[in-house]
Amino acid sequence: MGAIKISPDYNWFRSTVPLKRIIVDDDDSKVWSLYDAGPRSVRCPIIYLPPVSGTADVFFHQILALTGWGYRVIALQYPVYWDHLEFCDGFRKLLDDLHLDKVHLFGASLGGFLAQKFAEYTHKSPRVQSLILCNSFSDTSIFNQTWTANSFWLMPAFMLKKILLGNFSSGPVDPVMADAIDFMVDRLESLNQSELASRLTLNCQNAYVEPHKIRDTAVTIMDVFDQSALSMDAKEEMYKLYPNARRAHLKTGGNFPYLCRSAEVSLYVQIHLRQFHGTRYAAIDPAMVSEEELEVQKSFPQTTVEAEES
């Protein structure tokens, strides 16, 4: 059994944070699964959107760390949606059901792409206050699979899993990263054929982000510079798309830094969210913010943040 799955932190998380299931569509089979932790008085929480192979609990490190600092954190698992518009409409209904007018979104890989599409979808009546995009992309054509996107629903689960496992690191990795990969493989095994097929369809369906619709959104781009499924060209395209974005660079972390470099990822999320302290868009309980921190935040520069190897 994987080290993460039997770790004290993961078991503490599973025993203290309940998994909720919410239906917002007419189709009762479309169920959002989510963990909602931290002070309910916070009305602009940070919401985590997982990658193709991930479930809501892959962000358990961030939930534990950020709620300990006073933040409200929600981690989601998607229902089966087959196109981006359907996803955006369902996500909007979910926010309405949770009585959340605006939110901060952290998206990993596919989650980051969907976060951008939702910000674009709601640009006339904005629901997204800020974005943190981790190992993410802005154009699905980078995967060269737009021509197969409409056939994933026909493929058996074992074939879909084989496609996804091909993106996991196969070379030598450090023990912490190996544990993260084992955990993600376990999470992948928990997804059924429809869930896998719909996520791969969303990941590869021909689509791109229209940046002019979300140019006023605060963005942090978080990239890892070792073994990642994303090419350097895809990362450079993100930098061009968001020239004013803050950049959080991790030298190592692979495809799943939120698991194997969780302390650094949580720190950069905290740095990103500090710009909203003292406003109605704060994701933190005001009682947890000191006057000194607010003063420091007023002079906090837009910058690139580098992480040293652990």
Curated annotation (Swiss-Prot):
Domain AB hydrolase-1 span(s) in chain numbering: 87-159
GO cellular component, one term: cytosol
GO molecular function: CD4 receptor binding
InterPro entries, alphabetized: AB_hydrolase_1, AB_hydrolase_fold, Maspardin
Subcellular location: Cytoplasm
UniProt keyword annotation of Cytoplasm present: yes
This protein's UniProt keywords: Cytoplasm
Gene3D superfamilies to which the protein is assigned, alphabetical: alpha/beta hydrolase (3.40.50.1820)
Predominant localisation class: cytoplasm
UniProt record similarity statement: Belongs to the AB hydrolase superfamily.
Family annotation (PANTHER family): ACID CLUSTER PROTEIN 33, MASPARDIN
Protein name, as recorded: Maspardin
Top-level taxonomy: Eukaryota, Metazoa, Chordata, Craniata, Vertebrata
Gene symbol of the encoding locus: spg21
